Amino acid sequence: MATNTSVYRLWQLISPNLPVGAYSYSQGLEQVIHTAKITDEAATMNWISGVLEHGLARTDIPVLLRVYYAARKGDDEGALWWSRQLLAMRETAELRLEDLSMGAALLRLLPELGVPVPASELPFAAAFAIGASAWNVDPTDACAGYAWSWSEQQVAAAIKLVPLGHTAGQRLLLALGERIEGAVTIASGLDDEELGMSLPGLAIASARHETQYTRLFRS
């Protein structure tokens, strides 16, 4: 049986077992559920798919692509420049902290797995791109995998918080999976000056979550 180790490395990067603490964050989802703006499966789908298509597709994923190609060329300065652009797109301290915390965790892990990393703090998408590039993961597959991993974490949070049953969670993942190719296509077609998107609802939810009295997820 022929094997493609780059596929397995992608599975490793998107695994819930990757020790970067992704399970600790809800990206504002906890707050909108707390205020009863999301109460069922349909509303959960509307929120997550909206952030995927209007947020990740125009921020994280296109930056991931640019850092991937910079890493392929050994262009640490280019990778760092795009990383800073992504951090500048974060609209709250909570979202920035999450990004840097997960990025730092992956940057600590990658050298233990034989992947050299630049001596800079990077957001998670950039660290992910460096790992994917080093392991020769197809760039389109890397983008789709990143989007899937993010979607899976959001659904896991919703299952706990709404709450939703696990069958509902699987229906959500099935539906979100059908949106990922479109999100990657959007991201792949953006010119540099087109990157970036403001999501006021997400920004407000994240800012309010920072001071929410009781919460399961980090801020």
What are these regions (language model features)?
Residues 1-219:
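Metal- and O2-centered redox machinery and metal/ROS homeostasis
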